[in-house]
């Protein structure tokens, strides 16, 4: 327990849409100093985009993977229905999250939805391994958020919409 306390106490607070003061690699390197090799290995396996539950996954990661898998399935069904001009009612997230705005705004909205899911899971984890798992996932969300290049994305979006007209 002490090792988690000292590691977590020195981590900077993360805020959505604010560039983090620590990178994921810096976080994992610092965690290596405090965690056992087996525990550190579990932490390095955390992957925001992974939805397959593996044996040995901590309970919090299994829950997140189920959440992510259900979110993606519902989005795929919704997008498929839209292509066929059919109605589809989203049940896991507000429709406005994916309907309003350009593709970049929608992607940011979905990242924020994931962030909120992690925020809701966090109160039960103050100075434990679960907090570190959540922190790692949040760093991955921020990394993805700050890799978006708005001018390049807008150019590609306009190319795709022009060719489909």
Predicted regions mapped to residue ranges:
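Extended alpha-helical surfaces
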Residues: 1-165
């Amino acid at each position: 327990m002490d090792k988690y306390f000292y590691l977590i106490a020195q981590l900077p607070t993360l805020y959505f849409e604010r560039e983090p003061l620590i990178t994921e690699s810096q976080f994992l390197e610092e965690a290596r100093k405090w965690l056992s090799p087996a525990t550190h290995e579990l932490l390095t396996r955390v992957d925001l985009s992974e939805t397959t539950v593996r044996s040995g996954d901590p309970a919090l990661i299994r829950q997140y993977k189920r959440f992510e898998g259900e979110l993606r399935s519902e989005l795929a069904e919704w997008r498929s229905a839209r292509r066929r001009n059919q109605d589809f009612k989203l049940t896991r997230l507000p429709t406005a999250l994916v309907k309003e705005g350009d593709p970049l705004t929608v992607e940011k909205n979905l990242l924020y939805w994931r962030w909120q899911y992690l925020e809701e899971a966090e109160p039960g984890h103050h100075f434990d391994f679960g907090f570190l798992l959540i922190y790692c996932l949040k760093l991955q969300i921020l990394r993805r958020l700050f890799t978006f290049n708005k001018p390049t994305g807008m150019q590609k979006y306009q190319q795709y919409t022009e060719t489909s007209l």
